[in-house]
């Protein structure tokens, strides 16, 4: 799934950032 832009670079479980 996608992660919030603020935590995208921090969370390893996300495949991409949410726009």
From Swiss-Prot:
Post-translational modification remark: Contains 3 disulfide bonds.
Localization of this protein: Secreted
Main location: secreted
Entry comment describing in which tissues the protein is expressed: Expressed by the venom duct.
Alphabetized UniProt keyword annotations: Disulfide bond, Secreted, Toxin
Entry keyword annotation includes Metal-binding: no
Coiled-coil positions: none
One GO CC term on file: extracellular region
Disulfide bonds: 2-18, 3-14, 8-17
GO molecular function: toxin activity
Record remark on domains: The cysteine framework is III (CC-C-C-CC).
Sequence similarity: Belongs to the conotoxin M superfamily.
Listed name of the protein: Conotoxin 5
Species, as recorded: Conus textile (Cloth-of-gold cone)
């Amino acid at each position: 799934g996608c992660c919030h832009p603020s935590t995208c670079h921090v969370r390893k479980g996300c495949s991409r950032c949410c726009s």
